[in-house]
Curated annotation (Swiss-Prot):
GO terms for cellular component: cytoplasm; Holliday junction resolvase complex. It is found in: Cytoplasm. ATP binds at residues 34-35, 76, 79-81, 142-144, 185, 195, 232. It comes from Bordetella parapertussis (strain 12822 / ATCC BAA-587 / NCTC 13253). Its main location: cytoplasm. NCBIfam families: PRK00080.1, ruvB. Mg(2+) binds at residue 80. This is Holliday junction branch migration complex subunit RuvB. Belongs to the RuvB family. Residues 1-30 are annotated as: Disordered.
Amino acid sequence: MAIQSDSLSSLPDSPRIVAPQPVSPNEESIERALRPKALEEYVGQQRAREQLEIFIAAARKRGEALDHVLLFGPPGLGKTTLAHIIAHEMGVQLRQTSGPVLERPGDLAALLTNLERNDVLFIDEIHRLSPVVEEILYPALEDFQIDILIGEGPAARSVKLDLQPFTLVGATTRAGMLTNPLRDRFGIVSRLEFYNTDELARIVTRSASLLNADITADGAHEVARRSRGTPRIANRLLRRVRDYAQVKAHGVIDQDAAGRALAMLDVDPQGLDVMDRKLLEAIVHKFDGGPVGVDSLAAAIGEERDTIEDVIEPYLIQHGYLQRTPRGRTATLTTWRHLGLNPPAAASGGTGELFSK
């Protein structure tokens, strides 16, 4: 049965269409429907997938819980999907929560004591666990025991509770913020990388089939190359392109229809959107390519400093459009060329003057 897409008007105005985080609860429900259920259906992340295949097979042969797993990397790359796949492959239940939700030790204790043998507990944003909750987690991970304080004041006493063997799958976009004691308790650590265009095209083709959308190979490739290496963005763009194709292209997503739809959405062939270009154009036109301080840049484009640092900059820096230097932000040669402008001699390393003589 085909999965129904959300309508074009359901996206809020504020979130970016190329944001790697979910932009609505409706999108999260669609993501769950598109999510692969088994490792053999999972596209990309070859190293992590091959390692998990071996570790899961070995744990199942021994009848043991899989060792604790830490998944880290940028948002939207499939950490939650892998947690669900691990539980499916192990043939056990998955309990899901997130670091900010576990405010008190009792919150975590309630989850742990309700786990069945070899179940998977998935904690998203595990770097945001409070120190007091993290302390409860240490003996649970090592010895499958927790200490619970009963009573108050001088009459209070500590009681050890035995837990069923379980697997903790922790996910984080900021592995550097994990404490060393917590990081050391994970036996399996996998970093998820950005996807290449061919891998994303396979994901787009699979999702289009589940959405009952007619897509050509060229159409899938066009969506994939504008998706910033991120499956979540690829699936979101696919749904928007599907809407466009149903109205403007007789329901067929080919390269031309995909290109026109994404141009309408202001997503260019490199996956940059209006906010990206606004920032790059400000550096080039208002500050001669930089360097420029982030506060001056924020004032120039009318955005908050945190928005620039946390939302706009990361992709531009990772893909060579922007440099962050002690003196401020500087546009690279890639930016000048992307904007169709001739870079000054300083941006080209002085080669222009050298070759003009």
